[in-house]
Regions:
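Short hydrophobic/aromatic patch on the recognition helix
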Residues: 33-44
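Hydrophobic/aromatic residues within well-ordered alpha-helical segments
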Residues: 4, 47, 54, 58, ...
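C-terminal peripheral helix-coil segments that are non-catalytic and often amphipathic
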Residues: 121-129, 159-199
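Basic, helix-initiating cap at the start of DNA-binding domains
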Residues: 1-35, 49-52, 60
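Amphipathic alpha-helical segments used for helix-helix packing
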Residues: 86-110, 116, 120-127, 187-194
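Amphipathic alpha-helical packing segments from all-alpha helical-bundle domains
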Residues: 63, 82, 105-151, 155
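Hydrophobic alpha-helical connector segments
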Residues: 53, 64-97, 107, 168
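Conserved hydrophobic residue
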Residues: 21-22, 45, 132-133, 162
């Protein structure tokens, strides 16, 4: 993605998050991005598909960045802790990004895929290695509960009810306890130092 496309995607994400709508017009996008209308036409395939492009790029980007940030961490519980807390911290650092995720995570297929990447793989690995104790038939429900916990933590941060550290650690602790870890171990893993989100 070139610089102009990145700028347009960023502006579109802000507009979508603020309005809650999945459509926008070229003029408002150009104004929000601080570019000419011609720049929009020259850098986007089809403005009417911009929402889907932004959502898909966002999901792919977070998968890549979280995977890089948790490289070298073998324990599935520690990887889950890092991944969930990175989502919550990023919502604090980039509120428009967080609002976009919270607003559209359940209604957009590309964003639903956020939970199908590293979080799902870490859950499967945890089951396969005996780290987690839950029935395999409940995998999809468990993934939904963990995703919902993450979104709720992001919401608490965006609304100013909790700090990102508190909300992220609480969500991880509850998720790990639900996966069968002891309260003490879940709390310890949920409060480990968080690595930076890779670029």
């Amino acid at each position: 993605m070139n610089t102009a496309q990145s700028k347009l995607h960023e502006a579109a994400m802000r507009i979508f998050a603020e309005r809650g709508a999945t459509q926008l017009n070229v003029s408002e996008l150009a104004q929000a991005a601080g570019v000419a209308r011609g720049t929009v036409y020259n850098n986007l395939k089809a403005p009417e598909t911009l929402f889907e492009e932004v959502a898909a790029n966002l999901a792919d980007e977070m998968h890549r960045r979280i995977s890089a940030s948790s490289a070298g961490i073998d324990d599935p519980a520690a990887r889950l802790s890092v991944g969930l807390r990175l989502f919550v911290r990023r919502a604090h650092e980039e509120p428009h990004w967080g609002r976009f995720i919270v607003r559209f995570a359940y209604s957009n297929m590309a964003l639903q895929g956020v939970w199908a990447g590293p979080p799902a793989m870490d859950l499967q690995h945890g089951v396969a290695t005996g780290r987690y104790a839950f029935e395999p038939g409940k995998f999809v429900s468990l993934l939904a509960v963990i995703g919902g916990s993450c979104l709720s933590a992001m919401f608490l941060v965006l609304e100013g009810h909790k700090t990102w550290r508190e909300a992220g650690s609480d969500a991880v602790e509850f998720a790990l306890r639900g996966l069968g870890l002891s309260p003490e171990e879940a709390a310890a893993i949920a409060n480990t130092e968080l690595p930076p989100l890779s670029r």
